């Protein structure tokens, strides 16, 4: 799926996105709980880059948890970014946010950030070189000692365990209330439009972008966090 097709898809899904995936909140909340500890040592006035911020769930969580932080929200989908902006307005932290509609490479490299989140984004880059280049663009916008928290779907799709894990993941989504049509789209996307790679390979792509060796801090089903 090309960039514009992917952007159009998220534009179409923006209004119903949070409701559609609400049942998966326990996994999201577990990720955020560990994210808090990962970012706990950042400055009280840290600047955080949220790449592919979508409707702004992780931004809202961090804004409430760390009231002195400022955020740069980046997303190519105008509809998603509008919902993120509305969430910031309703949450009372709009003044601590700047919004950039577009892909990461169109965001100025300065000022630098103390941390970055990138959740379920890089997996849509099918070519390993493009994925490493994407992580390099994140690195260019981070200052010395900054921390990247990245999460993607990961597995060895050639292993016998993958089909069992995929079935379990689909059952989980179904029991969480994800509509059948969304499950069908997800299964098709995993085969065609998502680069599901072994966790060690994803970590290698991140490290190749000038980051230190990533440490995996999270896993729930297919979702891994480094």
Q: Model-derived features: where do they sit?
A:
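Conserved class I S-adenosyl-L-methionine
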Residues: 1-43, 61
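Class I SAM-dependent methyltransferase SAM/SAH-binding core
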Residues: 49-50, 55-106
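A short acidic, Gly/Pro-enriched loop at the edge of an enzyme's catalytic core
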Residues: 108-116
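A short beta-strand submotif of the Rossmann-like class I SAM-dependent methyltransferase core
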Residues: 118-122
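A short glycine-rich, Lys/Arg-flanked "PGG" loop and its adjoining helix->strand segment in the class I
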Residues: 132-144
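Conserved beta-strand signature within the Rossmann-like core of class I S-adenosyl-L-methionine
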Residues: 145-152
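C-terminal alpha-helical "lid/dimerization" subdomain adjacent to the S-adenosyl-L-methionine
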Residues: 153-208
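Conserved S-adenosyl-L-methionine
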Residues: 211-221
